Amino acid sequence: AHRIRQLLNGSENLAAHANCNRVQDPYSIRCIPQVHGASRNAWQHLLELTEIELNAVTDNPIITKTAEAISGGNFHGQPLAMALDYATVAAAEIGNIADRRCYLLLEGKNGLPRLLTTNSGRNAGLMIPQYTTAALVTENKTLCYPASADSIPTSLGQEDHVSMGSISGRKFNQVLGNLDKILAIELRDAAQAREFRRPLPFSAWLEFQLRLMRQQV
């Protein structure tokens, strides 16, 4: 919430809506700090566990200074596997709520034209990119099944419980790639919506970011 206040500081557009007739915004706007914050907590948890594992002794067996061989289980990937699955859900949820905000920008309410175009009857505007976000969000949901909940015995039963952490890592990376695309579409939609809010400026930081984006799109 503090970060959002910083980003919006000095926005004349925000000030102009201080006493408008909108009682409550939809959850996807009003609950951004709570939803994004929950995802941030999940990623922080993954970071903490990753640092622990990077500094841990994971060899097996462990050879001591006295040349004693000690068999152990520090190599097991369950700590990271479960954290990666948790982080995957967190990343997918950021995309889920972003898609809802994209939809809000396109539905033709609160002074914005439908599909963010002035001729929505003949011009599809930004309708198709929202198809993309919807598809990517759905794909991310299918990738949220926790790989760490599964286990297949190997090595004649000696390795009878495995973490499937490599699968967790691959799924996390795939969801992050999809999330990049979803957020890029949301940014482009927001920039287009901004054009219909002129001449009132947003905050200096947001105006700067929009100018950078408009140099590319």
Task: Enumerate the language-model features and the residues they cover.
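C-terminal auxiliary extensions adjacent to catalytic cores
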Residues: 1-217
